[in-house]
Amino acid sequence: MTTEAITPLRQRMIEDMKARKLCAGTQRGHILSCKRFAAFLKRSPDTATLEDIRRFQLHLAETDVSICNRNRIMTGLRFLFRVTLRRLDLAEEVYHIREPQKLPPVMSVDEIKRLLAVASSLKTRVLLSLGYGCGLRASEIVRLKVKHIDRAQNIIRIEQSKGRKDRNVMLSDEMLGLLRQWWKTRPSRYDAGIPLQERWLFPSRKSAGRPMTTRQLNRLFHEAAEAAGIKKGVTPHTLRHSFATHLLEQDTNLRKIQLLLGHEKLETTARYLHVATGMISAVESPLDRLARPKHKRPRKAEKNRKEVQPPA
């Protein structure tokens, strides 16, 4: 935590975000976006003009800022102008750039096997298995509690995930077995005194009563990927992409995959159709059909003669 004084403008913006129940990560992102704009202006953002916004957007375009990060900054500024300052004229000047539609990276089944085989510990293997076996986001994995594991119904409950939505995912026998192994060896000294159902599956070793961080999960994932010889750019989220893609290649209904991933729109899930290489490679090319020898079809007259039966 910093000791930086909170200005009245920032305090009002924080209150506006809390009133709309924006998650903590979104709030931090919006504040950082406005701080960046203020640093560019060298004065408070509530004094900004249309020309200031135009110059700032040109500045971002000329610097090494990705389209994704640039759009995040614009989202924060739009909230400031539209909600906190009620300056709709300035909010309209803030625009987003369409991001290139890139295919999500996916690991092959063989790469997944290698990744899990070289996991340096049972904890790492369980963490990675939750990503691939259940399609969970990194933030969902680290925030799992005992109460979320429903052995009676063979499901894992994901509470208040992205978009503040709850959902259920499958709990396979293999995954349940791994979780049982982990629970037997999991250190309990980090959450002594906490009711059993409220205990984190992966507690922090540094902060009592807190879960491990996504940064720690990311480090464990990359250590395993390097040991497995996986060179392409992958992250823990690649496990989720691979989960969806491999289910599609097993002919799992797209609607079911949408529910498991927690996507609001089916179109979001449908993008995995573009990376399901097993489905794509199974489609016969029309070029192959051209190369196949044609079977000679009998002429109509001959066919008719064959069909005529001799008189009894």
Predicted regions mapped to residue ranges:
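Conserved catalytic core of the tyrosine transesterase superfamily
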Residues: 1-312
